[in-house]
Amino acid sequence: MAYAVYLSGEIHSDWREEIMEGARALGLPIEFSTPVITHDASDNVGVAILGDEDSGFWKDHKAAKINAIRIKSGIENADIVIIKFGEKYRQWNAAFDAGQAAALGKSYIVIHPEDFTHALKEVDAQAMAVAQTSDQVVKILKYITTQE
């Protein structure tokens, strides 16, 4: 069985590449999709296309709405959503994506350091698995696709 997997969450490390490379190396039948992961492009898309704003709020609002087109589609079309909460920044968008996945009845896997367990207890409670490393996620994907 082939799966569509959406990789959501922090954009400051190469965790997505680790998971995609791990799945490819094992020959897993998975098609991955992601949000826009170039930070500057994601932050500036609204003003780059629709024009400058005097307020940071409206600049961010434009970008968030345009980025949401891809994010919403990615989550809706996924069989599994993988959401990473990184250590450096508070990823409110990752928590929002987890909420969307849960509301849509999507299976999702969360990755975060143990220190975040209390803060993310509600997010974790709805997750099908809570991992701390990309390698653990690859092992989960291997199990669900190969039964090994």
Walk through the language-model features, giving the residues of each.
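Conserved catalytic or regulatory cores that recognize and/or transform ribose-phosphate-containing ligands
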Residues: 1-148
